[in-house]
């Protein structure tokens, strides 16, 4: 175990500074279109919503982040396309929208044999799971800017205006259903790489907790696409949705000002326990950085909770309270 107690900021990512940068950028975006295409919400939720008559169009944009560096190290690129689509689609699902179309942006230092084919395989698989089309994209070779490659995309979805879920219907006493993640997903990888580097492990080493796969294999496990949430929306009275990504549970503040009591959270996968031990990362920092086994949350009345859990393979993990975010006895702040 590392004698250091690493944080996300130690690895070079300061969430508070990042939030300041985002706020500064948003403050400059003052022009607002009127009529068809007018924004229905402010910037800052999981997806942007646009007026389209009876419907709302929903848009998201996101990328895979520094997980691509591990893909390069392993020379295995067939999963990061799934990650790219998942990060966008899950944000659409978090406001209740159905994904319909996607465009990707691939920037790279140089072209490598088999690289584009594997990227395409992942994008196709993600699109099939999401039941949407990839309608275009951009590929740029930028050797003076990019070292390795970067993969991002933009996703379009739609829903009826009356079906928009922003969290305004969340009430104290509502139940929280947690849906398992597949592992680290696509956030926190700057800290992950720092931990691996300082621990003396290699991505090619067998996992200490499962010798049948390498550490790199486990870290490249693709982000789960929670498309079954659309089935929950048809069958249940849903009050709120949350995609657990960067900043971990802290991002729940964008859903509601009420509190979250996770009295029975999902068990984090072994990869999280390994990272916590090797990096000397405390539990608070882990929950402020990673999904910790819970990749998506559904907030709804108790009467529908078991049905939602059955549809998604999740379970009841907590309830809505007056204030704060708590995982058992741990206060997340």
Swiss-Prot record:
Instruction: Give the E.C. number(s).
Output: 6.3.3.1
Q: Which GO terms describe its cellular component?
A: cytosol
One Gene Ontology BP term is: adenine biosynthetic process
Which InterPro entries does this entry report, sorted A to Z?
A: PurM-like_C_dom, PurM-like_C_sf, PurM-like_N, PurM-like_N_sf, PurM_cligase
Fetch the SUPFAM superfamilies from UniProt: PurM C-terminal domain-like, PurM N-terminal domain-like
Q: Which UniProt keywords apply?
A: ATP-binding, Cytoplasm, Ligase, Nucleotide-binding, Purine biosynthesis
- Disulfide connectivity? none
Report which reactions are catalysed by this protein: 2-formamido-N(1)-(5-O-phospho-beta-D-ribosyl)acetamidine + ATP = 5-amino-1-(5-phospho-beta-D-ribosyl)imidazole + ADP + phosphate + H(+)
Identify the main location. cytoplasm
Q: State where the protein is found.
A: Cytoplasm
List the molecular function annotations (GO) for this entry: ATP binding; phosphoribosylamine-glycine ligase activity; phosphoribosylformylglycinamidine cyclo-ligase activity
Q: Which top-level group of life is the source organism from?
A: Archaea
Question: So, what pathway does this thing act in?
Answer: Purine metabolism; IMP biosynthesis via de novo pathway; 5-amino-1-(5-phospho-D-ribosyl)imidazole from N(2)-formyl-N(1)-(5-phospho-D-ribosyl)glycinamide: step 2/2
Task: Give the family per the record.
Answer: Belongs to the AIR synthase family.
Q: What protein is this chain from?
A: Phosphoribosylformylglycinamidine cyclo-ligase
């Amino acid at each position: 175990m590392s004698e250091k107690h690493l944080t996300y900021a130690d690895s070079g990512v300061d969430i508070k500074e990042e939030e300041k940068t985002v706020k500064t950028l948003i403050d400059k975006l003052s022009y607002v279109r009127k009529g068809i295409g007018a924004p229905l919400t402010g910037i800052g939720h999981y997806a942007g919503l646009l007026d389209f008559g009876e419907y709302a169009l929903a848009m998201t944009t996101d990328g895979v982040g520094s997980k691509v560096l591990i893909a390069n190290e392993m020379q295995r690129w067939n999963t990061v396309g799934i990650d790219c689509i998942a990060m966008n689609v899950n944000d659409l699902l978090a406001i209740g929208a159905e994904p319909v179309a996607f465009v990707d942006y691939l920037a790279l230092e140089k072209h490598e044999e088999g690289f584009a084919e594997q990227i395409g395989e992942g994008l196709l698989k993600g699109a099939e799971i999401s039941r949407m089309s990839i309608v275009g994209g951009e590929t740029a070779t930028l050797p003076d800017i990019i070292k390795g490659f970067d993969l991002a995309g933009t996703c379009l979805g739609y829903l009826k205006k009356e079906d928009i879920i922003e969290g305004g219907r969340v009430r104290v006493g509502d139940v929280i259903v947690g849906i398992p993640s597949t592992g680290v997903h696509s956030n926190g990888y700057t800290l992950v790489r720092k931990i691996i580097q300082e621990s003396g492990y290699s991505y090619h080493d067998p996992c200490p907790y499962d010798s049948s796969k390498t550490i790199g294999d486990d870290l490249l496990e693709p982000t789960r696409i929670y498309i079954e949430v659309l089935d929950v929306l048809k069958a249940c009275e849903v009050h709120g949705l949350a995609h657990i990504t960067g900043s971990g549970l802290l991002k729940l503040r964008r859903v509601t000002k009420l509190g979250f009591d996770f009295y029975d959270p999902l068990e984090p996968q072994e990869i999280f326990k390994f990272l916590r031990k090797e990096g000397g990362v405390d539990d608070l920092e882990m929950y402020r950085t990673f999904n910790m086994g819970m990749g998506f949350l559904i907030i709804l009345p108790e009467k529908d909770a078991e049905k939602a859990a059955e549809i998604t393979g999740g379970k009841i993990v907590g309830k809505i309270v007056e204030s704060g975010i708590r995982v058992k006895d741990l206060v997340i702040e």
